[in-house]
Amino acid sequence: MKAYPLEACGLISGPTIGSEADVVDEFHPCVNMAGSARVYTIDPKDHLRIEREVENRDNEVIGVVHSHTHSEPFPSPTDVGQAPDPNWHYIIVSLKRESPETRCYRIIDGDIAEETLQILN
């Protein structure tokens, strides 16, 4: 990830939200306003721009992707506290080891549930 050693972040978009099998059409890299290796903050300007772009294609933002540079791919207390939408998918890429590890979660009212993540291409 280009942002390393800082946390990288971005939004994902697709045609549906809230179904059992949401499909991600696009990854939208964002600036990490926190400039940190431990936390991320998506630039509100990036978020608004991406929301408008995907709505023009009848898609919507369906989640966020970010890296954990020094920890496992599991939501931190900060991640849980920042989770803005219970319908979103939260994809975390751990860079703790030589080979990155990616996992996906839903975060609803502070409860964390892992989801199956299938990468097609």
Model regions and ranges:
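Conserved beta-strand-loop surface patch within small alpha/beta domains used
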Residues: M1-V61, H70-N121
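Short, well-ordered beta-to-alpha junction loops that form the rim of enzyme active sites
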Residues: S67
